């Protein structure tokens, strides 16, 4: 079932009971299939909303990340036109506030777009959590640092940053297992008729119905409406965690991501982060559009000093 805003806003089920929480669920009732491509600027721009959904309503859903191959599936024609991709990235960054530096397509263009997708499946062989962390590190290196993430040395750096087992990752990178897993994702993309990325398909695991498909980027309220429609109740959002806990969990986050999660203006977010920077809790990572912030892990610093 495709997303229809009129249908969603017509739902009148409510549930304001404080008892309506994750404790009632042995299994989370909703599964979200998130179709992405590591080279897609809009997929990167979806990150603030995924984080906010996870913070407020993560007790209701699990995320299954699917590599769609929309950009990576050997689409040679597109990758012979770096100026076109540069323009897309620049427009996306200005529109969404999530920095993606299109200069990479002039300075260090991606040679083999298929490889990063294969690397994600290799990382996922170490677990779903490892796979998600690896995707994030790919995106940070690509969109912020302008690294060519089709190069093996950059992939190994990403694997290190994601705390993967490097020997296992190297062994799996071009393995038949990783290739088979990627083919399964591409097949699922076709079967679900996903022709645009990012796309999220929401499924209620307790009801045999078609999923609700949302293709593209929408305001956060739309994703909340979908959850309400599928749950047939109005879920109560969880409280946002203390900012330092949020930063410690995600390690590297953008000003835009923090502002979305905490419902702050960009100016207020900058002021709060500068306070933490002054306290040496975070360090600023300058970007072409806005800033990112890296949590300073004191325990690692102390361990290194003791060695």
Curated annotation (Swiss-Prot):
Gene3D superfamilies: Glutaredoxin, putative protein disulfide isomerase domain
Domain of life where this protein originates: Bacteria
CDD domains with a match to the protein in the record: DsbA_FrnE_like (cd03025)
Keyword presence, Cytoplasm: yes
Pfam families: Thioredoxin_5
Disulfide bond annotation, renumbered to this chain: none
Predominant place of localization: cytoplasm
Localization per Swiss-Prot or TrEMBL: Cytoplasm
GO cellular component, one term: cytoplasm
UniProt keyword list: Cytoplasm
PANTHER family noted in UniProt: CLPXP ADAPTER PROTEIN SPXH, GLUTATHIONE S-TRANSFERASE KAPPA
Protein family per UniProt: Belongs to the SpxH family.
Subunit text: Interacts with Spx.
Protein role: Adapter protein required for efficient degradation of Spx by ClpXP under non-stress conditions. Interaction with Spx stabilizes Spx and exposes the C-terminus of Spx for recognition and proteolysis by ClpXP.
Protein name: ClpXP adapter protein SpxH
């Amino acid at each position: 079932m495709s997303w229809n805003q009129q249908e969603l806003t017509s739902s009148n089920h409510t549930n304001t009971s404080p008892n309506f929480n994750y404790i009632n669920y042995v299994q989370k009732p909703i599964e979200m299939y998130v179709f992405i491509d590591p080279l897609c600027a809009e997929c990167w721009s979806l990150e603030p909303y995924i984080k906010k959904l996870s913070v407020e309503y993560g007790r209701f859903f699990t995320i299954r990340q699917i590599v769609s191959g929309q950009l990576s599936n050997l689409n040679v024609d597109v990758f012979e036109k770096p100026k076109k991709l540069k323009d897309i990235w620049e427009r996306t960054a200005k529109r969404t506030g999530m920095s993606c530096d299109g200069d990479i397509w002039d300075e260090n263009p991606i040679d083999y777009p298929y490889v990063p997708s294969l690397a994600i499946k290799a990382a996922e062989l170490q677990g779903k959590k490892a796979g998600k962390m690896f995707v994030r590190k790919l995106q940070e290196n690509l969109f912020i640092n302008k690294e060519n993430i089709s190069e093996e040395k950059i992939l190994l750096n990403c694997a290190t940053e994601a705390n993967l087992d490097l020997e296992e990752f190297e062994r799996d990178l071009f393995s038949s297992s990783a290739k088979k897993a990627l083919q399964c994702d591409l097949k699922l993309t076709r079967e679900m008729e996903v022709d645009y990325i990012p796309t999220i398909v929401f499924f209620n695991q307790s009801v045999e119905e078609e999923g609700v498909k949302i293709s593209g980027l929408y305001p956060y309220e739309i994703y909340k409406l979908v959850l309400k429609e599928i749950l047939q109740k109005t879920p109560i959002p969880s409280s946002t965690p203390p900012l330092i806990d949020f930063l410690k969990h995600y390690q590297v986050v953008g000003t835009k991501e923090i502002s979305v999660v905490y419902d702050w203006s960009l100016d207020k977010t900058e002021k709060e982060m500068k306070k933490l920077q002054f306290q040496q809790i975070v360090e600023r990572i300058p970007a072409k559009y806005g800033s990112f912030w890296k949590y300073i892990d004191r325990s690692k610093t102390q361990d290194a000093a003791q060695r």
